[in-house]
């Protein structure tokens, strides 16, 4: 104790001497507490002296926050900000809660807190508060959180309850939902494996679409890859490893716990009377090439029989809903089901018109997506596969680009997403339809460009057609063969070619090469998001290290990725075929099927990680109030209540595109 006392006295003396140099004289204190207090004051003054030197460097910005005595001004005090934060933290919950008070108690609540007066006070304090809080106050005063807005409809069951109240709608048409690429859970059904990987440990565990997937890819990467990769030669299951798509609504409602996909749609359909006897989720193994889905799983046969059963039991035609790649699957199915031949549907012409009431194309990729090209060239996945951020981070973090490329190349379903229509849709080196959007000095038709060439192998820029050809040329022979057997990415030059292409399955995923079915009573709804920057073109470089991946996006470039209008994944121009169909009867739409186009503006809620009820992002659109509203109206037989809306110039672009017919 004596030692501590002497040390403190010495510190006091030192502090006193230093303070005397600055012109301040302090009396000695006898109390130990006062000695500590004096020590603290001396420490603060030393900091003040040091701060004075820094103040000369910082200049007016530092002095502006202090008054003439060197103290912080009251408006910049942390204590003031804390008090204001606490004040707002108490009053704002009352403000939001007032909107949800029962009608019988609303007057009492309004008398308790006068929100008009609160807004006046908030106006007085807005200039003092941080920018984030000020923006929050602006949203409140603008009425962005009123009950009449769609934000309130982001809650569970909200859209269904509102439509039930306003229109008294009820379930009518059976509903079949076809999910998009990678959004269906994949689970292991194998029990053998090999010497390095015992498959029985993963029996009936989801190796895609669960936290178990994340744990396995981190803890046992080699085993996880052996399960999810397909056999390169056959495109089917590798020996001793068996994965299958999860079934039922659980297969697509959530990707990972907390990250919903179709759950909002299920909830709202349930409100108006839908249940498993009236709707189903047609989950599929999206890794497989389309005809391999039929060859291995009889997927299209099961889908046909499910639709026929629904039609027989209910007496109503079926409503098909496809999201993303699911829309391609539905378009393919409508050609498959009426085609004749082995592994085909053999339903005969007229089957679609007899069994299908409507086709809802929600953010569909009927003409592909540019992101599929860098996925197959250089394994880009973080921004290519729009799903749970944690899952995509795991794929980017724990797998090299070479590993990702090899995995993606075995998945025969991925090439189906390659863009279709060549220069008609995607432009050439001279121009593209989207160029006027941003007044580009360059053109989006220049899809892949090389700013730094290290060899003669890649010494020119590439259009979309050239880029796809290059992608295949640097791919393994077995991938080239599978793509040529399963898909086609061009366009038909005349009506005769359109009809001829209906005979072979490789054309059925491309609406530029085959017409819509003869189904005059079917209705098509194309609903997609706009106003969200979307990848459209890329700058690539050739790596010097031959042992590494040969081609990668050149992130050292000033602009490695060129963005355009879209929904964050699918660019606007990829919906061109909907507008071509909507022009009326033509070789592409021989029956004159009625096509309704609804463009949804992406207006995400800044306080909702999934964007809220007004989001039109590629995946989050499934939770938007507007899309759910349309789905329920169409499924209940009230599709006439869906009003077309075009916010972009795509219809004008399509009229100027060089379609051959």
From Swiss-Prot:
Motif segment (GHSXG lipase motif): 322-326
EC number: 2.3.1.158
Membrane topology of this protein: Single-pass type II membrane protein
Catalytic residues of the enzyme: 324, 567, 618
Key words of the record: Acyltransferase, Endoplasmic reticulum, Glycoprotein, Membrane, Nucleus, Signal-anchor, Transferase, Transmembrane, Transmembrane helix
Biased composition (Basic residues): 34-48
Annotated catalysed reactions: a glycerophospholipid + a 1,2-diacyl-sn-glycerol = a monoacylglycerophospholipid + a triacyl-sn-glycerol; a 1-acyl-sn-glycerol + a 1,2-diacyl-sn-glycero-3-phosphocholine = a 1-acyl-sn-glycero-3-phosphocholine + a 1,2-diacyl-sn-glycerol; 1,2-di-(9Z-octadecenoyl)-sn-glycero-3-phosphoethanolamine + 1,2-di-(9Z-octadecenoyl)-sn-glycerol = 1-(9Z-octadecenoyl)-sn-glycero-3-phosphoethanolamine + 1,2,3-tri-(9Z-octadecenoyl)-glycerol; 1,2-di-(9Z-octadecenoyl)-sn-glycerol + 1,2-di-(9Z-octadecenoyl)-sn-glycero-3-phosphocholine = 1,2,3-tri-(9Z-octadecenoyl)-glycerol + 1-(9Z-octadecenoyl)-sn-glycero-3-phosphocholine
Membrane-spanning segments: 81-101
Substitution effect: residue 618 to A: Abolishes catalytic activity. Fails to localize to lipid droplet biogenesis sites on the ER
Main localization (coarse): endoplasmic reticulum
Motif Bipartite nuclear localization signal: where in chain: 43-50, 64-71
Lumenal-side positions: 102-661
Glycosylation sites: 453, 461, 469, 594
Any Gene Ontology biological process: phospholipid homeostasis
Class in the EC hierarchy, top level: transferase
Annotated effect of mutating residue 324 to A: Abolishes catalytic activity
Ranges facing Cytoplasmic side: 1-80
Residue ranges with Basic and acidic residues bias: 54-70
InterPro entries: AB_hydrolase_fold, LACT/PDAT_acylTrfase
Family annotation (SUPFAM superfamilies): alpha/beta-Hydrolases
Gene Ontology cellular component terms for the protein in this record: cytoplasm; endoplasmic reticulum; endoplasmic reticulum membrane; lipid droplet; nuclear inner membrane; perinuclear endoplasmic reticulum
UniProt family annotation: Belongs to the AB hydrolase superfamily. Lipase family.
Functional description taken from the UniProt entry: Catalyzes triacylglycerol (TAG) formation by an acyl-CoA independent pathway. The enzyme specifically transfers acyl groups from the sn-2 position of a phospholipid to diacylglycerol (DAG), thus forming an sn-1-lysophospholipid. The preferred acyl donors are phosphatidylethanolamine (PE) and phosphatidylcholine (PC).
The protein's name: Phospholipid:diacylglycerol acyltransferase
């Amino acid at each position: 104790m004596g030692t501590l006392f002497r040390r403190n006295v010495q510190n006091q003396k030192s502090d006193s001497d230093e303070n005397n140099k600055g012109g301040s004289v302090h009396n000695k204190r006898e109390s130990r507490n006062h000695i500590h207090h004096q020590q603290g004051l001396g420490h603060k003054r030393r900091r003040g002296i040091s701060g004075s030197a820094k103040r000369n460097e910082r200049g007016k910005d530092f002095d502006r926050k202090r008054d003439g005595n060197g103290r912080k001004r009251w408006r910049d005090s942390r204590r003031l900000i804390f008090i204001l934060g606490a004040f707002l933290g108490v009053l704002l919950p009352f403000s939001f809660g007032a909107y949800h008070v029962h009608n019988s108690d609303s007057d009492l609540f309004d008398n308790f807190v006068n929100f008009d007066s609160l807004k006046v006070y908030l106006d007085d304090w807005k200039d003092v508060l941080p920018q984030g809080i000020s923006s929050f106050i602006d949203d409140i005063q603008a009425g962005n959180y009123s009950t009449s807005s769609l934000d309130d409809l982001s809650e569970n069951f909200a859209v269904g309850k509102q439509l039930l109240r306003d229109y008294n709608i009820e379930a009518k048409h059976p509903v079949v939902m076809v999910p998009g690429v990678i959004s269906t859970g994949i689970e292991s059904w194998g029990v053998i494996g090999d010497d390095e990987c015992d498959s029985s440990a993963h029996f009936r565990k989801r190796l895609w679409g669960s936290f178990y997937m994340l744990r396995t890819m981190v803890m046992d990467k080699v085993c996880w890859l052996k399960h999810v990769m397909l056999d390169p030669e056959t495109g089917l299951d590798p020996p001793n490893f068996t994965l299958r798509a999860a079934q039922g609504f659980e297969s697509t409602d959530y990707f990972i716990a907390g990250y919903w996909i179709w759950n909002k749609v299920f909830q709202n359909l349930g409100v108006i009377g839908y249940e498993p006897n009236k709707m189903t989720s047609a989950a599929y193994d999206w890794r497989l090439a389309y005809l391999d889905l039929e060859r291995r799983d009889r997927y299209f046969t099961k889908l046909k029989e499910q639709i026929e059963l629904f039609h027989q039991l209910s007496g109503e035609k079926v409503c098909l809903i496809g999201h993303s790649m699911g829309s391609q699957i539905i378009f393919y199915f409508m050609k498959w089901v009426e085609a004749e031949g082995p592994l085909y549907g053999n339903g005969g012409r007229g089957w679609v018109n007899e069994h299908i009431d409507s086709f809802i194309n929600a953010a569909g990729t009927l003409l592909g997506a540019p992101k599929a090209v860098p996925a197959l060239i250089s394994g880009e996945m973080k921004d290519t596969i729009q799903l749970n951020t944690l899952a995509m981070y795991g794929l980017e973090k724990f797998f090299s680009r070479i590993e990702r490329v090899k995995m993606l190349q075995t998945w025969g379903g991925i090439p189906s997403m390659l863009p279709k229509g060549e220069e008609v849709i995607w432009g050439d080196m001279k121009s593209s339809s989207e160029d006027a959007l941003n007044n580009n000095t360059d053109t989006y038709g220049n899809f892949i460009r090389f700013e730094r060439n290290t060899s003669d192998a890649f010494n020119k820029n590439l259009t979309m057609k050239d880029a796809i050809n290059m992608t295949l040329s640097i791919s393994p022979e077995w991938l080239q063969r599978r793509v040529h057997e399963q898909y086609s990415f061009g366009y038909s030059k005349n009506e005769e070619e359109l009809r001829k292409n209906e005979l072979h399955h490789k054309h059925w995923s491309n609406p530029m090469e085959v017409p819509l079915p003869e189904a005059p009573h079917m209705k098509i709804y194309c609903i997609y998001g706009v106003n969200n920057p979307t990848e459209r073109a890329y700058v690539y470089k050739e790596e010097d290290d031959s042992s590494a991946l040969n081609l990668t996006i050149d992130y050292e470039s000033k602009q490695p990725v060129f963005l355009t209008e879209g929904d964050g994944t699918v660019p606007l121009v990829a919906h061109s075929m909907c507008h071509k169909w909507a022009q009326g009867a033509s070789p592409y739409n021989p029956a004159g099927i009625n096509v309704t186009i609804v463009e949804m503006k992406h207006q995400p809620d800044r306080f909702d990680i999934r964007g809220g009820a007004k989001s039109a992002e590629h995946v989050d659109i499934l939770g938007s109030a507007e899309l759910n509203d349309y789905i329920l109206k169409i499924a209940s037989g009230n599709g006439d209540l869906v009003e077309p809306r075009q916010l972009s110039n795509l219809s004008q672009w399509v009229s100027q595109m060089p379609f051959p017919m």
